[in-house]
């Protein structure tokens, strides 16, 4: 048994089979429609989220894990015999999950619970946990894994092409006028996670097809070596994600490029149809 338990917020979108194979523990964040709360990927699938969103007048909100839920998880891991816990969070700039985890760690065992701000989102965040869990299974200490995670945090990136501006408007990130003009002119923002973990529009492209091509160009310009894992992500747009995957595979034939769902928590802001690319350096 590994001495270090790896915990990921559910926003990491780690497939269930990977969670099981690597003994990763998941702390679930919820999406909220009115008074009804759903844990992402447990109580609500991406398909159900899109269907519910299409028939919902307002903007869904998100709910971070409760302190009670987080404390119970930590205590159960120590009861199982783990000596240390590393909890990898979605960017602290985008959710209160990181602060809640810090508070809970202080209450349970601050010396042996290490709360790590990934400063990123969705499966880019998930890869932090996947590679950390591999290190834990190899017998690495908590300090060794934390140093490894610092390296990943300095060498990762996430870009998303936003197809539908509705949620950006509902959430106040775009004015009604900006959203109307954007829709009329088919303006599609390219958003990037910044080094401090904020999510900002960095380019505006006319038509979604050209926005997807820009994602591919950015990935190509980066000239990723085989030390990097490259992935494609989407929310309800598998066809577009496969197109991006196919073109990236031609550029990077030695990389295994897989497709993952975007976190429902992120989809609340990014809206349906968004496609993203992300990469982390893992060795």
Segments predicted by a language model, with ranges:
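N-terminal glycine-rich anion-binding loop in soluble enzyme alpha/beta folds
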Residues: 5-64
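Glycine-rich phosphate- or other oxyanion-binding loops that anchor nucleotides, phosphorylated ligands
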Residues: 57-58, 64-91, 99-100, 146, ...
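Mixed-charge interfacial surface used for oligomerization/domain docking
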Residues: 11-36, 93, 97-114, 121-283
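Short beta->alpha junction loops
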Residues: 64, 117-119
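Short, Lys/Arg-enriched, disordered terminal segments
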Residues: 1-3, 282-283
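Short beta-strand segments
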Residues: 7-8, 87-91, 117
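Acidic/glycine-enriched edge-of-secondary-structure segments
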Residues: 50-67, 195-209
């Amino acid at each position: 048994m590994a001495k270090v338990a790896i915990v990921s917020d559910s926003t990491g979108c780690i497939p269930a089979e990977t969670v099981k194979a690597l003994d990763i523990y998941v702390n679930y964040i919820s999406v909220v429609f009115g008074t009804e709360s759903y844990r992402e990927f447990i109580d609500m699938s991406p398909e159900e989220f899109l269907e519910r969103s299409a028939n919902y007048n307002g903007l869904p909100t998100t709910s971070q894990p409760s302190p009670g839920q987080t404390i119970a998880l930590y205590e159960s891991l120590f009861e199982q015999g783990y000596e240390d816990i590393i909890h990898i969070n979605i960017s602290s700039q985008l959710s209160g999950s990181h602060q809640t985890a810090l508070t809970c760690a202080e209450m349970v065992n601050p010396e042996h619970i290490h709360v790590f701000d990934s400063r990123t989102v969705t499966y880019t965040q998930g890869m932090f946990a996947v590679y950390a869990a591999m290190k834990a299974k190899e017998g690495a200490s908590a300090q060794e894994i934390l140093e490894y995670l610092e390296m990943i945090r300095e060498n990762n990136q996430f870009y998303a092409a936003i197809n539908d501006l509705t949620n950006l408007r509902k959430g106040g990130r775009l004015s009604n006028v900006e959203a109307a003009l954007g829709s009329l002119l088919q303006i599609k923002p390219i958003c990037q996670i910044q080094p401090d973990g904020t999510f900002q529009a960095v380019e505006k492209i006319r038509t979604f097809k050209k926005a997807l091509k820009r994602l591919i160009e950015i990935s190509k310009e980066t000239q990723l070596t085989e030390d990097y894992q490259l992935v494609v992500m989407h929310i309800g747009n598998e066809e577009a994600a496969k197109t991006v995957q196919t073109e990236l595979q031609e550029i990077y034939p030695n990389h295994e490029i897989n497709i993952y769902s975007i976190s429902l928590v992120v989809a609340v802001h990014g809206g349906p149809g968004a496609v993203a690319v992300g990469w982390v350096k893992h060795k």
